[in-house]
């Protein structure tokens, strides 16, 4: 096991990489489609229909490239989450296992964003061009994206963000407190095993609610939606636990403070 002084910088480096990747992901999924990062070539008349696009190599080639990037990300994200791989990385990296997973996920996502191929001449599922839709639809999408990202950041902070990023494991190890998940209740551990992506609805809003849903954006939204759907396995027991925790937190928030009590 590496000395504690080496564990802390490694965990912090992984967190900084993940944070920077998250900022870049906001730009990739929200700012670029909403604020017009990629100029279109020739307008809607230059776009092809869906049947013609399936026979055009200039569209199929970048589409296949983008598909490969997404499969690379999904494969890394799923493979490193497998129990055997987690056991192997825990054996050789110890408390840095989660930090390693986060860093590799951030690097895979960086590859997707950096080498993504837009398809400006491909067919679109919908496009807001005529007034008043050309003004109000982008504005509505922008508002929904802002709300979704605020909810995502809020949920991550509440959902033990330090443990998800691997910081808490190193912190507890340095202080000799053991594994942070070992201190959680069995019901909480069961929930975490079923729901390691606690921002599904908000992320789906970001992926699908855009003024123009082109070919490459449709591929991105569809595959990530499919992956998020398959990654969740909530049942009635999990929902009852979530409901009980929400009621407990609301009860604590509704209790008067000591200074306000009569």
From Swiss-Prot:
Stretches assigned to the Perinuclear space side: 29-58, 115-133, 211-216
Compartments (UniProt record): Nucleus inner membrane
GO cellular component: membrane; nuclear envelope; nuclear inner membrane; nuclear membrane
Keywords on record: Membrane, Nucleus, Transmembrane, Transmembrane helix
Predominant place of localization: nucleus
Transmembrane feature ranges: 5-28, 59-80, 98-114, 134-164, 192-210, 217-234
Matches recorded under InterPro entries: Nurim-like
Topology versus the membrane: Multi-pass membrane protein
Stretches of the chain found on the membrane's Nuclear side: 1-4, 81-97, 165-191, 235-262
Family label: Belongs to the nurim family.
Name by which UniProt lists this protein: Nurim
Organism: Homo sapiens
């Amino acid at each position: 096991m590496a000395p504690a002084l080496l564990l802390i910088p490694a965990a912090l480096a992984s967190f900084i990489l993940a944070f920077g990747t998250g900022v870049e992901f906001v730009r990739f999924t929200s700012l670029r489609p909403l604020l017009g990062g990629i100029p279109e070539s020739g307008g809607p008349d230059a776009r092809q229909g869906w049947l013609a696009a399936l026979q055009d190599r200039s569209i199929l080639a970048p589409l296949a490239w983008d598909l490969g990037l997404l499969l690379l990300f999904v494969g890394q994200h799923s493979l490193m989450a497998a129990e055997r791989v987690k056991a192997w990385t825990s054996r050789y990296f110890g408390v840095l296992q989660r930090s390693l997973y986060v860093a590799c996920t951030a690097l895979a996502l960086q590859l997707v964003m950096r080498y993504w191929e837009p398809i400006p001449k491909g067919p679109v599922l919908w496009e807001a061009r005529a007034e008043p839709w050309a003004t109000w639809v982008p504005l509505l999408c922008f508002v929904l994206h802002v709300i979704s990202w605020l909810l995502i950041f809020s949920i991550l902070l509440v959902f033990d963000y330090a443990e998800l990023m691997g910081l808490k494991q190193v912190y507890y190890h340095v202080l000799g407190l053991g594994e942070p998940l070992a201190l959680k209740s069995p019901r909480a551990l069961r929930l975490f095993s079923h729901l390691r992506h606690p921002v599904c609805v908000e992320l789906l809003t970001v992926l699908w609610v855009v003024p123009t849903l082109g070919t490459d954006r449709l591929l991105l939204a569809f595959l990530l939606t499919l992956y998020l759907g398959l990654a969740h396995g909530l049942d009635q027991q999990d929902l009852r636990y979530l409901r009980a925790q929400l009621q407990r937190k609301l009860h604590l928030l509704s209790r008067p403070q000591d200074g306000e009590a009569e």
